[in-house]
Amino acid sequence: MSLSTLSHPAAAAAGSGKSLFPAGPAAQSVHFPKARLPVPAAVSAATAAVHAEDRVSSLTQVSGVLGSQWGDEGKGKLVDVLAPRFDIVARCQGGANAGHTIYNSEGKKFALHLVPSGILHEGTLCVVGNGAVIHVPGFFGEIDGLESNGVRCGGRILVSDRAHLLFDLHQAVDGLREAELENSFIGTTKRGIGPCYSSKVTRNGLRVCDLRHMDTFGDKLDILFKDAASRFQGFQYSKSLLKEEVERYKKFADRLEPFIADTVHVLNESIKQKKKILVEGGQATMLDIDFGTYPFVTSSSPSAGGICTGLGIAPRAIGDLIGVVKAYTSRVGSGPFPTELFGEEGDRLRKAGMEFGTTTGRPRRCGWLDIVALKHSCQINGFSSLNLTKLDVLSGLSEIKVGVSYTQTDGQKLQSFPGDLDTLEQVQVNYEVLPGWQSDISSVRRYDELPQAARLYVERIEELVGVPVHYIGVGPGRDALIYK
């Protein structure tokens, strides 16, 4: 894969007050604002608070927060910020492969994997929908960790009776399959997600409701064990192992029972009662089983369609969808990454952004923002707005590149994000170069107080994808957010 760089008028025109972008169907003119007198800190904070309240209160009854890249965009933080204004926060797909890092009001860090990010807010009901897969030991491990830190979970979490159970055997199979593929690693988290969804699709999986029928639970689990043993030589299976697992799940069944509910009914009744629901997506659109960089994808649908199938609510009930996009791009594991940076440039973003997986701890691959991939995500999901995260990480760069288009080896420009990986691996990325900024922006809370070049960057993204940026992250804390 090669790249080319387009000279951009922004570098020369910054601060001139003139339009920085050519007029045309894909872009509107952007002008830098005239110089302003300093605003007293108290007035600035009050104005920012009012703007934030207006922005959040205007969200629709059922809203969603979805990842628009390859995950790790910072979805959990936005869900945590928005959750107090919603009655319910719901997860619709995925499992413990999703890692959401959030901070409470005291700055304490919580790494969540299956429990929805709304759990830190006492008045919020958290729902794990039918589209998710549940590793019960891991689920209780999360709950125990939260409660040991003073977060009450009892009576605040509902788990769908239709959700599929993820067993340790699925995790074992995940590792065996990855080893079998040798050099063609997909980059699985080895949490058993893919094998569990495989069991679901082949219709021999067990669901949460099966825990209510322990008289037949062992026979159903035996089928899963035998299937794994017949497929993988390295999988150890015995009747004694099956018996141990059944006894273990008898105890889990008793503890899980208070959490189990028909969440499809609960959510639809809540919609009738005008309660507000915030949907928290796991992973991201570029990892979608249908629309991502297949086969280097997850096993569920982290795009807008997964909300309906993963929660059992009608498409017409869904209103605002917020796409979360990092100010640059990262991905964990294998797979195409057209704008990836190598060497010192990639290391600089990785260190500044602390780009190490919440779930795996693996260093993330880093690169420039890919507008082609972002437009693909916006098209599929119909985002009403974007949350641009980690803008502060770009501080200190003399220039910032944005991948705006792909060119094929024959010189033809691609009109869309290709589904063919061979094509994607060979594209040439065409970049625009924008001026960077040197100041630390982590304490900025008003959009008009950002450096001129930072505002240019935000507005150019809006122009290129045709979706407004309403939220801008400038640090990890829940207060490090600008409402635009």
Swiss-Prot record:
Cofactor(s) needed: Mg(2+)
InterPro entries linked to this entry: Adenylosuccin_syn_GTP-bd, Adenylosuccin_syn_Lys_AS, Adenylosuccinate_synth_dom1, Adenylosuccinate_synth_dom2, Adenylosuccinate_synth_dom3, Adenylosuccinate_synthetase, P-loop_NTPase
Pathway linked to the protein: Purine metabolism; AMP biosynthesis via de novo pathway; AMP from IMP: step 1/2
Cofactor descriptive note: Binds 1 Mg(2+) ion per subunit.
Residues the record lists as binding Mg(2+): D72, G99
Superkingdom assignment: Eukaryota
Pfam families: Adenylsucc_synt
One GO term (biological process): IMP metabolic process
Swiss-Prot/TrEMBL keywords: Chloroplast, GTP-binding, Ligase, Magnesium, Metal-binding, Nucleotide-binding, Plastid, Purine biosynthesis, Transit peptide
Residues that coordinate or bind substrate: T358, T359, T360, G361, R362, P363, R364
Coarse class of the protein's main subcellular location: plastid
Active site per database record: D72, H100
GO molecular function: adenylosuccinate synthase activity; GTP binding; magnesium ion binding
Quaternary structure, from the entry: Homodimer.
Protein name: Adenylosuccinate synthetase, chloroplastic
Organism whose genome encodes this protein: Zea mays
